[in-house]
A protein has these predicted regions:
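Boundary detector for helix-to-coil junctions that initiate low-complexity/charged tails
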Residues: 1, 263, 671-775
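N-proximal low-complexity "stem/linker" segments adjacent to membrane-targeting elements
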Residues: 2-52, 285-289
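A conserved mid-protein helix/loop that constitutes part of the nucleotide-sugar donor-binding site
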Residues: 45, 309-314, 485-508, 518, ...
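Conserved donor NDP-sugar-binding/catalytic core segment of glycosyltransferases
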Residues: 129-160
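Acidic donor-binding loop at a coil-to-helix junction in glycosyltransferase catalytic cores
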Residues: 200-207
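Short alpha-helical donor nucleotide-sugar binding micro-motif in glycosyltransferases
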Residues: 548-549, 556-561
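Aromatic "clamp/platform" in nucleotide-sugar-dependent glycosyltransferases that forms part
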Residues: 569
Length: 775
């Protein structure tokens, strides 16, 4: 999996650097459900890489039709002969003569035995989960006729390509659609497929325009699936790729498909999730995969920067190193900026919102669990995972299930994810927690103490360790003196980490101490506010706002800093405290959650929170002022913290402990008396779960519209002279009406739903809008 921020174009899907899941069918060769079509003309040895990327697909219900378009080079024919008898799913079709790539594709498509056609060139590569996600996308979205994803260009030219079917009408001016894709067979049958008169390239551009002209179109999944091999001069292979010929061919397209260039383009509206929508129960296939290692399914909300995800990544790393296969499934819409971090250790990663409608989540999970035959399922911070527990238990009564929680959240769902643990503990074999504090919290509220197992998240003490050399280098690069006290605030900049408290504390300390510097490493919704605060209060010389930083840089920042300051609103035990102490930093944090299980008075300060913000600011400021006045104490506490973490909280101890918990979960489950869950009841629970999530998503979207609207109202109220003096009253009224109706169109579908709650604040918005726009 490629890191879009720092792409490694050598780490292709067939690179030995990639983690190996060893996908292959269990038992007999499965019946094909997709047909891969590949034209082959003297490709040669590079074809072995393409073949490897096909053979290692996670979806094994395929057939591969390789159309030999009259190859003549002996070496190329020898390569092709290797695949004639390698696998019964591979069929080499020998054309009577060289007929051109369009004819070769059409020939293979006619020979295909399935309703789904995958187009793949003989020198390109596919990510291992490509076919599986494309197949399920077209199953979940019957209104779309084809699908693809983003592409990685490698070879002579390296770049990332994000355009495709999502670009819509841009296809009329430029061939923005990558060739590799999955299409419904019917589009070829109804349009005739590729133009066989085109033998010099661009036949795929013509195909996309032909399909659009016939009313067919597709969608782009926001993931990298296809690796496109580039050459120094593409026109050496295809004459039509020369700039002049491209311009000429655009004129040809205008003549062939005039209605496209006169304004027509297929508009396909995705079917949105409906109220109380029936949940499909049928799964299309088993896709039973061979298994020779233990397997864990990890259900998480997303893959984003944060302590919980760092723990998940380290767990996946350790388990795969111990011989486990780990599959990761995420359930919330997200850009998943840390997906590549998980991808270092497993390629079996599925972000359900990227390729499935909400209603298809339950049957996909049923299919997925059957396909992989997991030894255990682990749920962590995943609300949908909890809501689907009755369904999972009903479908798989012999499957051990555990969860893992880091912290309670009293102001969200009466306790956060641990509250869901309490609600669904009957379905859990083991309850995992990251602190004794959280264990006590659960037991006090009715959890079965016998089920609870504790594992601290711990830290890599070799990676996070003092480095005088890095300290000097980083400080020199930032213009900071070697003996200058440096305070680090490393966190997501949002309400849970209290950036407003942090900022006011620094402002207070700066008034009495002029010799220290602050580094802020992190991003989040409150970063713009923090930036404004720093500027408005003249703290630019004292505070460096670094934004989100990659993990290697975070290691260096900790090595260059002296004090970690994190005034959290709530925590379990913040992972960044483990990292800071391992790096030799003194820590100043909040006395919340289980943090005193890690931070002792010898290592740092934990400050009691206060309902009075001013008092809380005073408490933190007093601690920091005292430390800055006693630099030797900072160093002493840093050394003590390092010693404590090395002795008690090493990362390998976490890995071993989690393996113990997993083994215990499996053993406990199989020692239990059989439990019987109603399959019908499980499906009913799944329907209720999906309706709950659907309503949540709609309300969240409506709330965002409300916030945007109120921000716009405030801006409109502040700009009383928004209209030029020369505007007539009629012109001004028309503009006001236009803006009002734009707001109404975007917001009021959600207003109507949210108004049912009876909230006076929401119900007043309509009148406020009219008042602001003087209507």
């Amino acid at each position: 999996m490629i890191n879009p921020q720092r792409p490694d174009f050598e780490n292709t899907p067939v690179s030995p650097q990639r983690p190996e899941y060893r996908y292959r069918p269990a038992g007999e060769t499965p019946a094909p459900l997709v047909s891969i079509v590949t034209p082959y003309y003297n490709t040669g040895a590079i074809f072995h890489e393409t073949a490897r990327s096909v053979l290692q697909q996670s979806f094994q219900h395929w057939e591969w039709l390789i159309a030999n378009d009259g190859s003549t080079v002996p070496e190329a024919l020898e390569v092709l002969d290797h695949y004639r008898s390698l696998d019964p799913r591979i069929r080499v079709i020998d054309l009577p003569r060289n007929m051109g790539t369009s004819a070769a594709k059409n020939w293979a498509i006619r020979e295909a035995r399935t309703d789904l056609i995958v187009l793949l060139d003989s020198d390109d590569l596919l990510e291992p989960t490509t076919l599986e996600k494309w197949f399920w996308f077209l199953l979940s979205y019957p209104e779309w006729y084809f699908v693809q994803g983003w592409s990685v260009a490698f070879g002579a030219n390296n770049y990332l390509w994000h355009r495709g079917f999502c670009s819509g009408r841009e296809i009329l001016q430029e061939n923005v659609v990558d060739y590799a894709s999955m299409l419904r067979r019917e589009v070829f049958e109804k349009t005739g497929g590729f133009n066989e008169d085109m033998r010099t390239g661009l036949e795929d551009w013509d195909l996309w325009c032909k399909l659009a002209n016939a009313g067919f179109w597709g969608q782009t999944i926001p993931e990298y699936f296809k690796w496109y091999r580039t050459r120094e001069n593409h026109s050496e292979k295809w004459e039509a790729w020369q700039p002049k010929r491209l311009a000429e061919f655009r004129e040809v397209l205008k003549e062939r498909y005039p209605r496209l260039y006169e304004g027509y383009f297929p508009e396909i509206d995705p079917v949105e999730s409906a109220e109380n929508e029936p949940i499909p129960e049928e799964i299309p296939c088993e896709n039973a995969l061979a298994k020779d290692r233990k397997r864990l399914l990890l259900l998480i909300p997303w893959m984003v920067t944060g302590g919980a995800d760092k723990f998940n990544i380290e767990l996946v790393k350790y388990l795969t190193g111990q011989g486990w296969d780990v599959s990761v499934v995420t359930t919330k819409p997200s850009e998943n900026e840390w997906a590549y971090e998980y991808g270092h250790y497993t390629g079996d990663i599925f972000s359900l919102p990227n390729f499935l409608r909400l209603r298809d989540y339950p049957r996909f999970l049923r299919y997925f669990i059957q396909s992989r035959r997991f030894d255990a399922v682990m749920i962590t911070n995943c609300e949908l995972g909890y809501l689907l527990l009755p369904f999972i238990r009903a479908q798989f009564p012999d499957l051990p299930v555990l969860d893992f929680n880091h912290a309670e959240a009293e102001d969200w769902k009466s306790g956060g994810y641990p509250r869901l643990t309490l609600t669904f503990q009957h379905y859990l074999d083991t309850i995992g927690v990251s602190s004794l504090h959280l264990k006590d919290w659960l037991v006090e509220r009715g959890a079965d103490a016998r089920k609870i197992e504790t594992c601290y998240v711990n830290v890599d003490t070799d990676l996070f360790a003092p480095s005088p050399e890095n300290r000097r280098r980083v400080r020199a690069g930032m213009g900071l003196a070697e003996d200058l006290p440096v305070i680090l605030y490393a966190a997501r900049i949002d309400i849970e980490k209290q950036p407003r408290v942090f900022a006011r504390v620094i402002q207070r300390v700066a008034a009495s101490h002029d010799r220290f510097h602050v580094l802020v490493a992190g991003d989040g919704p409150d970063l713009p506010w923090l930036r404004s605060f720093v500027q408005e209060n003249g703290l630019e010389e004292r505070v460096s706002l670094l934004g989100a930083v990659p993990r290697p840089r975070m290691v260096e920042l900790m090595q260059a800093s002296d004090i970690l300051f994190l005034p959290s609103l709530r925590e379990g035990i913040a992972l960044v405290l483990f990292e800071a102490m391992a790096s030799g930093m003194c820590v100043v944090g909040a006395d919340v959650g289980g943090q005193k299980e890690l931070v002792t008075p010898e290592c740092g300060y934990l400050v009691c929170r206060s309902d009075d913000p001013e008092e809380e600011v005073e408490r933190y400021a007093a601690v920091l002022e005292d430390l800055l006045a006693n630099p030797e104490r900072i160093a002493t506490m840093g050394r003590a913290g390092r010693e404590r973490v090395v002795e008690n909280f090493r990362l390998e101890d976490m890995g071993r402990r989690m393996c113990e918990i997993l083994d215990h979960t499996i053993q406990v489950h199989h020692r239990r008396h059989p439990s019987f869950y109603s399959v019908d009841g499980g499906w009913s629970a799944a329907a209720m779960a999906m309706e709950t999530i659907r309503l949540q998503l709609e309300l969240i979207e409506g709330w965002r519209y409300r916030v945007e609207l109120e921000n716009a109202l405030q801006a409109a109220q502040a700009q009383t002279a928004a209209f030029p003096a020369h505007f007539t009253p009629v012109e001004t009224l028309r503009i006001r009406q236009l803006v009002y109706h734009l707001f109404r169109k975007s917001f009021f579908p959600y207003y109507n739903r949210m108004g049912l709650s009876g909230s006076d604040r929401i119900l007043r918005i309509k009148e406020r809008v009219k008042k602001v726009f003087d209507l």
